[in-house]
Structures are given as structure tokens and as C-alpha cells.
């Protein structure tokens, strides 16, 4: 009986080793492809929020990590991608969190030019209710295009609110919390850039390039 148990344990151990080895080999063979796909997805989003005619540098390499919970909605350092044309600063793409979405945190990226005018907004991830809050996603509606051409005049700019709160941005029928959260997050990101643009250009480019 003891011999049978030892044999069974040996077989299980060998199986575990083989399975682990297979996982490691698969990861080694696919990690470069996965990293490339992630880089291409990031590049696509960056070019959507910072138009190609606004920069000639590789945005995903011109990246600095910034830790500012008040502006970016999280105490985790967030990437800010600095755009330039012929060596001159022309804007940025700022990743930020709207922590007060209806179903949790909403991750966004905001593009601005050097005059702090919004050139694009995209939602990177969310858990909002399908058919209601998910209208922030460009695959559902183009609601985020309402930010294009806008800027923030002051930290307490009251126009940066949904119409229900006296602002300029549409809310969704039956889902005011979601657009309200995104509007506030975009406003904070734009104002942060507007008041820290010079400082951002002096920070180290310390994001990990995949």
C-alpha cells in the first residue's frame, strides 16, 4: 500500500513539473508577441487622443509617471505621454482614474494640445452597466467626443459638469453618475496639465517600455 502511494505521489509530482514547464515554455514563446500587441493597442489609443499631425515623436517612449491623487484619481503613479513636433512640446496624453463611477473605477486617457485644449478622450476600462453607463465607450456611442475642443478655465469652472448639474455635458437617461464621474476626471486631468505643463517637461521618462 505504501509503495502504491509513493508511486502515485511521484506521478503527481512529475505531472506538476511537466505542467509547470509547459506553462513556462508557452509564456516564453508568446510573451514577445503579447508585448507587441499591447504596444500596438497603446499606440492606437495614443494616436486617437493626440492626432498624428500634432506630434512626430514616439509617444509611448516619451512617458513619465506622475503620482497625484487629487488630479489623477489614484495614489498609483499614472503615465503621462508627452507629445512633441520637431523637438518642441505640443501636448500630452494623460491617463487618469474616475474613482466614483457607478460600478467602480473608470480608467480614462485624455489628450490635450499645448494650449490645454482637449484633442481626444478614450475610456480604457470600466465596469459600467450595459445599455446605460457603458455609453462612455466609443464602441457604444461617441459621447466622449463632446470634450473635443474644450478647455478648463479654472479649478472651479462650473461649466465642467453634466447638464443636470448646470454644466455643458450631456448625461445619460437613467445613468447620471457615470458621465458625471468621467466629466470630473477629464476636468481634473486637463487642469492638472494646464497648471503643470512646464514641470511635466522636466520629469524623467521613466515608464517601462514594453
From Swiss-Prot:
The keyword rRNA processing does not apply. Its EC number is 7.-.-.-. It is a single-pass membrane protein. Its cofactor is FMN. The chain crosses the membrane at residues 9-29. GO terms for biological process: electron transport chain. Keywords: Cell inner membrane, Cell membrane, Electron transport, Flavoprotein, FMN, Membrane, Phosphoprotein, Translocase, Transmembrane, Transmembrane helix, Transport. GO terms for cellular component: plasma membrane. The modification FMN phosphoryl threonine is found at residue 176. One of its GO terms (molecular function) is FMN binding. It holds the Pfam family FMN_bind. It comes from the Bacteria. Disulfide bonds: none annotated. It is found in: Cell inner membrane. The complex is composed of six subunits: RnfA, RnfB, RnfC, RnfD, RnfE and RnfG. Part of a membrane-bound complex that couples electron transfer with translocation of ions across the membrane. Belongs to the RnfG family. This is Ion-translocating oxidoreductase complex subunit G. It comes from Aliivibrio salmonicida (strain LFI1238). The lineage of its organism: Bacteria, Pseudomonadati, Pseudomonadota, Gammaproteobacteria, Vibrionales.
